[in-house]
Amino acid sequence: MAEHIDGSRLDTDLRYRFDYLSKFLNFTSDDIIALNTLARVATPLINSVAEIIYQKLLEYDITKNYFLRTTHDFKGTMTTDGNQLTLQSEQILFRIHSIRKYLCRILRQSTWNDAFLEYISNVGKIHTNLAGTHSIDVDYIHVNALFGYLEHVLIDGVIHHDEIDERRKNEIIIALNKLFWIQNDFFSMHYLNGSKKGNNDKKAK
């Protein structure tokens, strides 16, 4: 007999949503241990990955332009000319530091408690237009592309890491894949909710 899943609750209860995703993807404590193992040996990898993905974002004007916007959390000197924007620009260095913190957090987290689920949910929400003054408002296509690229870069780093044995590499790669599908879902959840809200607002007029 099929297990019942409450569709409406998936949209309102983060724990319930995560539990469903975890069961579907078979994301277990073993995967969390594999991610924690990567975190213990991957500080240089995380540092380089952060720079690599921002270099990728600066390769296209459509993604580069997002970093020319003023955001609530950046207090440094803004480079406002896209032609002058580089990895050494203050707003990019700030973002590189932020994503390093994010990667360290999601890889080191040993217990996926409600506070952590709120964290990865909020990371998604601020990229939409639903977080008020905290919103970055990035089109989802760029978020999705970045997750794909980020996962690829991390997996490539794991494959070529000399301090990780082959068995553990396989476990880490599988765990990373599950991790980013879950995180991507926690992003798309907010984008879909925003789309539903917009459609409901139109119907109400």
Regions found by a protein language model. Give the residues of each.
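Heme-based O2/NO sensor domains and their adjacent alpha-helical segments
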Residues: 4, 18-23, 43-157
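Short terminal or interdomain "cap/linker" segment that borders an active site or interface and mediates
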Residues: 2-3, 9, 16, 160-205
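Short, motif-level signal for alpha-helix interfacial/capping segments enriched in acidic residues
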Residues: 36-41
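Charged, compositionally biased N-terminal leader segments and the immediate start
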Residues: 1-32
